[in-house]
Amino acid sequence: MSPDDLSRLMPFLVLASALCLFALISIVLRLALIERSWPAIGRFVTARGVKAHVIEQGSGPEVLMVHGAASNGRELISALGHRLTDMRLIAPDRPGLGYSGRPKNAATLGEQAAFIADILRQTASGPVVAVGHSWGSGVILRLALDHPELVKALVLLAPASHPWQKSASWLNRIAGWPILGDLLVWTLPPLVGPKLAPKGIARGFAPGPVNPPDYGDKIGTPLFFRPKAYKANAEDMVIGSAEMGKQAVRYSSLTLPVTIVSGQGDVIVYNAIHAAGLKRDIPHATSFRVPEAGHMPHWVDPDLVEGIIRAHATDTVYEGSSAQFRAEP
């Protein structure tokens, strides 16, 4: 390239450099604002050699709450915490999400269950009622399989539990690549994610409206768009189906009380694969289907979920308080 060619290109190179610098500054400021707006509100313990962020509330019967994908420990405690004030709630951020660190091999359900087990050994005095939403259901199922002494009952909300056919999205696959993956997680999620979040939240609540309307702010959805959280979630998604398949063959060995709560209109996790699969593999499980709910049955009717948790905490059986919440056969 001749000096003349270089001089002609120089304005474009300067402009491109300025735009890249502006984008970088914008991303750093956005990430700082997210963490100022939704700071860590729990305490930190060490689990599997890394820091684990755990939100705790109250005293009484102990209830573990494990959130799903693209989320954090605020989700379940925001839905149910004000109802369960006479119980001790333990709501960790799963590995790499929220404010928890991510140990090696953390995408495997066995490692995530071991991470939760380490937390429980430091925060719980005995076996807990374990509540899991979506992906969190797969984690607490593995917890019950690998660490049965820590769990007295399972409450599975819109559970992800079995292998499925659809492959991981291209964004999730690329996020794990060297260099290009890092470039992706540092640009697209922080810049574009907050604009797309309302559509994703609406899909989770469909067929009903988003309720509460400020759901994203209440649970700190923007925390997911930080690079480390997005990358961690992507890693989970890429091997998730295979991981669920490995443990699904063991479900029939579970003997503890299990309750499944699914939404009739769930378009995120298909009931025919997961809720029905659990009922087939764990015949003694009790299963409830909420007619007007999608992927968020604990928000659509928290009365049902509260009743189930209280029943398990007191070793009784919840049979439903309303005709619309009939137990499935």
Residue ranges of each PLM-predicted region?
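Alpha/beta-hydrolase fold catalytic core
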Residues: M1-P61, T85-M87, G126, T314-P329
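Conserved alpha/beta-hydrolase catalytic His-Asp/Glu region
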Residues: L33-I34, P189-S253
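Catalytic active-site module of serine/aspartate enzymes centered on a nucleophile-bearing elbow/loop
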Residues: P283-P329
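Short beta-strand/loop motif that positions the catalytic acidic residue
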Residues: L254, I260-S262
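Conserved HGGG/HGGXW glycine-rich cap/lid loop of the alpha/beta-hydrolase fold
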Residues: E56-Y99
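Flexible "cap/lid" loop of the alpha/beta hydrolase fold
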Residues: L145, L154-W186
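Active-site loop/oxyanion-hole signature of alpha/beta-hydrolase fold enzymes
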Residues: I55-Q57, A91-V131, W135, S167, ...
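Acidic catalytic loop of the alpha/beta-hydrolase fold
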Residues: G265-V269
